[in-house]
A protein has these predicted regions:
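A short, polar/charged loop-to-alpha-helix boundary motif
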Residues: 18-29, 329-339
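Short active-site loop at a secondary-structure junction
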Residues: 21-94, 141-149, 231-234
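Short, surface-exposed beta-strand/loop micro-motifs that present aromatic residues
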Residues: 307-316
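Single conserved hydrophobic/aromatic residue that forms the stacking wall/gate
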Residues: 1-7, 11
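Hydrophobic (often cysteine-bearing) scaffold residues that line and stabilize catalytic clefts
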Residues: 34, 38, 42, 152, ...
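Short, gly/Ser/Thr-rich active-site loops of penicillin-recognizing serine hydrolases
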Residues: 252-256, 266-278, 329-351
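Short, surface-exposed loop or secondary-structure junction motifs
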Residues: 72-296
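Short, well-ordered beta-strand elements
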Residues: 317-327
Length: 351
């Protein structure tokens, strides 16, 4: 866990083990699969291209991926599965705010059932092949009309490749990782760093911790190079100190120790609400680009499937990051830690 406020490190602690069988403790430079905490990095990559005038958030996706020009929208008419044209064309903004109608396939709907059947993230293909296949599936709803967590940000990752002319990993490195000194963040773990990678756990039917053996989920274990499928929504491995640098850049409005990664306006767009209807199921919350926004405090946050979490609070000049590697039902440890930090700030500010 780590907490930084007003340029001061407040909390910097490590607890537990990264490998239970080897009794190996968490170290400062331990590496973690961050899963969906990849999404804000993809959003920043898109906004660096926006800053260069190479794309706009309200550009139609079909401008960069022509296959989406004919993508239909699912419509259930009198119990029959039909489709209709897009009333408002799908845009990059829709992709980054989960209002695209491109789901993961986790819910009970006809379109979700197609995604669940296809299992896109388990395929041996490139992000180009995956994206063009997605374009053949009807959107779950008309773009911009609903919120549904899904693969839209992976499609945005492919747009980064199309616009930049670079593979996603290379563009991340050039535009974000190198300027921020994020030397341990990438889509795979090279051989010389394999011993720093935390094991990924789940729980069995008796609630006992066991190693997760699903290699399709255990990303970042390949030692020979990046995977064929570079997912802008879930693919990165990172250290806590690396991700703190990314958060500090956003907190400081796109700048990191004199290096400007994003314009102030672009950083503001990332961390402010882009959904007029807010964040589905969470009163008082909105959604920025690839992250939630507290509509009262302006706090920007997100997390990953293995129970990693971060918060950036511009009002209190605060960053909080929590990492673990537990792929199971939701846990409250990160929220409890964050709540304790918030209570401490109230006490400090009242003195």
């Amino acid at each position: 866990v780590r907490s930084r406020r007003q340029r001061q490190m407040c909390i910097r602690d490590r607890y537990g083990l990264v490998d239970i069988a080897k009794n190996k403790p968490v170290e400062e430079q331990s590496l973690f699969r961050i899963f969906s905490m990849t999404k804000p990095i993809t959003a920043v990559a898109v906004m660096t291209l926006h800053d260069q005038g190479m794309l706009k958030l309200d550009d139609e996706v079909s401008k960069y991926i022509p296959e989406f020009s004919n993508t239909q929208v699912y419509k259930n008419f009198d119990g029959k599965h039909t489709s209709e044209p897009q009333k408002k064309q799908l845009t990059i903004r829709h992709l980054l705010t989960h209002t695209s109608g491109i789901p993961y396939g986790w819910e009970w709907s006809y379109v979700d059932s197609i995604y669940n059947f296809k299992q896109h993230m388990r395929k041996d293909w490139t992000i180009e092949e995956m994206t063009k296949d997605i374009a053949t599936i009807p959107l779950k709803f008309q773009p911009g009309t609903q919120y549904n967590y899904g693969l839209g940000i992976d499609v945005a990752g492919y747009i980064v490749e199309v616009v930049s002319g670079m593979k996603l990993d290379a563009y991340f490195k050039s535009a974000i990782f190198d300027p921020l000194g994020m030397d341990d963040t990438r889509f795979y773990v090279p051989k010389e760093k394999q011993d720093r990678l935390a094991e990924l756990y789940t729980r069995d039917e008796n609630d006992k911790l066991i190693v997760l053996e699903d290699n399709a989920i255990k990303q970042g274990i390949g030692a020979d190079g990046p995977p064929k499928l570079l997912l802008g929504g879930a693919g990165l491995v990172s250290s806590l100190s690396d991700y703190e640098k990314f958060c500090r850049m956003l907190l400081k409005k796109g700048e990191f120790y004199g290096k400007r990664v994003l314009s102030e306006r672009a950083a503001e767009i990332v961390m402010t609400n882009q959904n007029p209807d807010g964040y589905k199921g969470y009163p008082g919350m909105g959604h920025g680009l690839s992250g939630t926004v507290n509509l009262e405090s302006g706090e920007y946050s997100w997390g990953g499937a293995a129970k990693t979490s971060f918060w950036i609070n511009p009002t209190h000049d605060l960053i909080v990051i929590c990492y673990t590697q537990l792929f199971s039902k939701p846990t409250e440890y990160a929220q409890e830690f964050k709540a304790a930090v918030d209570r401490a700030i109230i006490v400090i500010d009242s003195d």
